């Protein structure tokens, strides 16, 4: 479906789309939190999940830029890793199906679909808002998704019915008791570091899981632990915009 999708070229002066890109960057944390929990599900819940990012190269007449979709996403708090889903229109320095890495600040959109309902898709809705009803129908048919009201962008599952889902993922609330029991039986894993120096506390902070972070701290996780590039869990919480997590990790005087 997505591999054959049209790449949309948008002029830099298109203010609605540019504003949409800014909103996507500010809310990317919700996208990554959902993917973080998707990896813990026995049965996947997402139809797909992708990020749109800016790719560019120097051309004869100046810089060539294209916004294209990436899937198979991993995020380390600074960079997004994935596989390019689109076939570039003009760029020759990257190919469809190639593994790519982009700074999180270079994204222009994110979207995941759960039970046929799209979340994110800020630039998509901005462009749909400039279409006629007939054009929107054709656009949605090409995607195979009903994007609904172009003025509405959902961030998290059932956010209208359960606004608390913006603060904490429902899976986090549901499994925190079991997680605490695991910590009581094996707190040593909190001090394990991967090849890049990340501890479990780093990963939970990046994903915005405040309940998990709180439990880890209570069982001895070291908030001063740094990655190989010198980042603490607090650094990542601040970068992502998880204030509730940052408050837990702030040094106590």
Swiss-Prot record:
ANK repeat feature ranges: 196-225, 229-252
UniProt keywords, alphabetically: ANK repeat, Repeat
Gene3D superfamilies: Ankyrin repeat-containing domain
Protein name as annotated: Putative ankyrin repeat protein NMA1343
